[in-house]
Regions:
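Active-site-proximal substrate-binding groove within the catalytic cores of carbohydrate-active enzymes
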Residues: 66, 70-106, 110-339
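Acidic/aromatic-lined carbohydrate-recognition and catalytic surfaces
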Residues: 1-56, 140-143, 147-150, 307
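Active-site-adjacent "subsite" loops/lids of carbohydrate-active enzymes
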Residues: 22, 26-96, 187-188
Length: 339
């Protein structure tokens, strides 16, 4: 949900069983003196952190973070808030927000996508070990102190005890859709080679993360690298979601929805029932069933088995059943979850 939604809208959606959420960030912050130069100003930057709470490098200079486009087309970098200092800003902002806006979830951008850093400020020095500690304390504040569903970007195993989902864990960083962190809603017709070969390259991908953490945290595609971003590989993304027992991610406006409604419904039906059936179960096995790796199978602790065919030829299983190209088979779904 966008941050501008009013309290009554949020409450109405809560009553419908929708997981309402708010975007938030405690890492990047722009110099207020540059605001007039920018094309847009991020309303969630912790502006009061500038400059006293910035990370300083060994030379005493503030390090550069996310770059924002200026009105003249140039890029202006943000500073980076020291992890030790970020917690106080969250502990002030979150409860104030919840007094009037009853969100049930909060997404903390960048925290698990950025490295552990050293800060050489004499006022708040930290080591990389400290950085890890304070990053996880920030997430723990959201999920445990304020009892919200908590998500963060990309993901890191150190944060698993404190978050419920990672936006971007399904999307391998170097192989995401072009400019996926900026022009997120733009649909692309041409699939870059690196995306086709590795992001949805069934010959190369292994669900190592899911084999360890599937029953602990939900993995999603990156918000600029979602299921319908590149329609030519939408089927492949759906198959990976089903195989890994993870939910899809969609982004659309009204025109996109009306144009592709049936395709969105198809994607939902092929992925969400599997995610629902396996969400709290450990992934216990992953197999390649053909020499070219086009047919793969995963098994979950509750007995669910998912088989998908990434290839362009039908596959006949040991029991004689045939799996069509881009097809999937789900067996062992508990009766209380449906298919």
């Amino acid at each position: 949900m966008r941050n501008g939604a009013g309290p009554e809208t949020i409450k109405a959606m809560n009553d419908l069983g929708v997981l309402t959420s708010r975007y938030d960030i405690y890492q990047d912050v722009m110099d207020p003196g540059k605001f007039s130069l920018l094309q847009w100003k991020h309303g969630d930057w912790p502006t009061e952190a500038w400059p006293k709470d910035l990370i300083l490098n060994a030379a005493g200079d503030w390090i550069k973070g996310w770059e924002v486009e200026a009105k003249d087309g140039s890029m202006i970098p943000c500073g980076v808030v020291c992890d030790k200092q970020a917690i106080a800003y969250a502990d002030k902002r979150v409860p104030e927000d919840l007094k009037t806006h009853p969100y049930r979830c909060r997404f903390i951008d960048t925290t698990t996508a950025s490295p552990w850093r050293e800060c050489y400020s004499p006022d708040h020095p930290i080591t990389r070990t400290d950085s890890r500690k304070y990053k996880t304390e920030l997430l723990d504040l959201v999920s445990n102190k304020y009892k919200l569903v908590c998500g963060s970007e990309t993901g890191h195993d150190a944060a698993v005890p404190y978050v419920h989902y990672f936006e971007g864990m399904m999307s391998l960083g170097p192989y995401r859709a072009p400019d996926s962190g900026r022009h997120m809603q733009k649909i692309l017709d041409e699939v870059p080679d690196r995306v086709a070969k590795f992001q949805v390259g069934w010959q190369y991908r292994l669900p190592l993360w899911e084999l360890v953490y599937h029953d602990c945290v939900v993995a999603q595609w990156y918000w600029g690298d979602y299921n319908n971003k590149l329609p030519a590989i939408w089927d492949k993304r759906d198959l990976f979601n089903a195989l890994y027992g993870t939910p899809p991610m969609f982004m659309f406006d009204k025109a996109c929805w009306e144009k592709s409604r049936d395709r969105f419904v198809q994607s939902y039906r092929n992925t969400c029932p599997v995610a629902r059936a396996t969400s709290y179960s450990e992934m216990t096995d992953h197999k390649f069933l053909t020499a070219d790796r086009s047919v793969q199978q995963t098994t979950f602790a509750n007995g669910v088995t998912v088989t998908v065919n990434f290839g362009d030829r039908p596959y006949k299983g040991a029991d004689g059943t045939e799996l069509v190209p881009n097809g999937l088979s789900v067996k062992g779904v508990p009766s209380d979850t449906g298919r």
